Amino acid sequence: MSKIIGIDLGTTNSAVAVLEGTESKIIANPEGNRTTPSVVSFKNGEIIVGDAAKRQAVTNPETVISIKSKMGTSEKVSANGKEYTPQEISAMILQYLKGYAEDYLGEKVEKAVITVPAYFNDAQRQATKDAGKIAGLEVERIVNEPTAAALAYGMDKTDKDEKILVFDLGGGTFDVSILELGDGVFDVLATAGDNKLGGDDFDQKIIDFLVAEFKKENGIDLSQDKMALQRLKDAAEKAKKDLSGVTQTQISLPFITAGSAGPLHLEMSLSRAKFDDLTRDLVERTKTPVRQALSDAGLSLSEIDEVILVGGSTRIPAVVEAVKAETGKEPNKSVNPDEVVAMGAAIQGGVITGDVKDVVLLDVTPLSLGIETMGGVFTKLIDRNTTIPTSKSQVFSTAADNQPAVDIHVLQGERPMAADNKTLGRFQLTDIPAAPRGIPQIEVTFDIDKNGIVSVKAKDLGTQKEQHIVIKSNDGLSEEEIDRMMKDAEANAEADAKRKEEVDLKNEVDQAIFATEKTIKETEGKGFDTERDAAQSALDELKAAQESGNLDDMKAKLEALNEKAQALAVKMYEQAAAAQQAAQGAEGAQANDSANNDDVVDGEFTEK
């Protein structure tokens, strides 16, 4: 069976891992980094992903960041003269991760386990699955991020019974899960969280502070300047990271904008104490989900054996202190918070292929599921923190005499009224025989699969007629749309590879022309006429090929120029080496003269 890769598709950074033997290994990206920025940019029709995309975010307005926060919504992003769904942008990130995983493994990768925040609802999970499909991946399992982290932490502790609390504060989401580990069973007891809390919010607090201070000083609102705002974002992220290690950092952004008197610069120092003050409310918000999860699990703090920190934002000292204060425990630092989720996903991939034995993962649904009943009430069929996969049925009836159909309004959430919860979908059961209200028996069955994705069935027990749907939110993609996007992604992958090859060649040509012109200039009048003329001739031919835009011709002429330029460089090197040797010889002779002069003795002369 081919390898199943594990992917942590994060808000700010993503990672990919694979199981090698019994070890889960993070695969480094082409730049040698173990995590990849979840950033996509478009330039001259080319799709750029990861580190290169993040580097040009300041100067390129066609850059998309934090797309994960839009998953499961109908929001689209405009770039490259097109409108893209969050699933398509996420698919570009997944495609990039898949590509360098294939390069590392030396084989095609077609299957993946992808992680999502535990508090993702059905629409967000479905959107993640669709993104995988568009990227050419069969998503074998959607796993909750804290659960994946627990898998990676507990893999070598399967002989030990433990209750652990996973505190996962990422770039855009926050989850807390409580698990029981024992005999290879990873049983999620409860999960809670906040889908709108993460490292991005901590960055935003710094940005708001810098904008306010600059406005106070200069009367200019930097938040209205797109390019200045992107520079502020980069500076805020860097300052936040710096303050995890030092107590004060300097933020320096020269030429941030211009005033009536000329260019203006932003120079400010930020202390850790000030940062803690700015973000105090965010740290406070992490406490409620911790208490909620403990309450749902029916556990007291004294029953928790270990606290595991996951996500880059758990490096913030105030967050670590809050976790200690809230749990009364020193967090376990045996796992890398940036990598552990992808590693756990790869382990789950190994469980599916059978490479990892005697491990059972029992996850839960994070939110209650049910339907709208008379008076707009939300009637729960499946409570939150129910172990999945699961199925639950309940019998309902009609609200009016001779009612021919019932509308099934499927919802997810915890509020008592339907209007306050998230709509997952609606469907109708029709052709109900005429009968007084309360007589027809309508059985509604909810099924949640191992990925946390919901399907609902309504059945008239009198006629045995039934209606069945897999929930697709209003913001979800149809099969046709997914197929079209898959084809686009495949076509783009080929076109992108070709375009990248072209860009690389053109850059190489530019570099070779610049370097050769410099060498020819430097060797003027130094007696290498034959080599200089040959290099000049090859240079002119390459320039002509560059002008024509013929790639094959450019490739051939580039090789020819490299050969001639190399010959000229060798001559230069030989001359330089000879000159150095001659200089060393002269120094030696001078040293000998100096040594001979040492025999002369100074004496005093006295007049008589």
Curated annotation (Swiss-Prot):
One of the Pfam families matching this protein, by short name: HSP70
Signal peptide coordinates: none
PROSITE patterns named in the record: HSP70_1, HSP70_2, HSP70_3
Presence of keyword Magnesium: no
Transmembrane segments: none
Cited function: Acts as a chaperone.
Induction description: By stress conditions e.g. heat shock.
Entry's family note: Belongs to the heat shock protein 70 family.
Keyword Zinc among UniProt keywords: no
Modified positions (Phosphothreonine) in chain numbering: T173
Low complexity composition-biased segments: 578-598
Protein name: Chaperone protein DnaK
Name of the gene encoding the protein in the UniProt record: dnaK
Keywords, in A-Z order: ATP-binding, Chaperone, Nucleotide-binding, Phosphoprotein, Stress response
Region (Disordered): 578-608
MF GO annotations: ATP binding; ATP-dependent protein folding chaperone; unfolded protein binding
Alphabetical list of InterPro entries matching this protein: ATPase_NBD (IPR043129), Chaperone_DnaK (IPR012725), Heat_shock_70_CS (IPR018181), HSP70_C_sf (IPR029048), HSP70_peptide-bd_sf (IPR029047), Hsp_70_fam (IPR013126)
Compositionally skewed regions (Acidic residues) per UniProt: 599-608
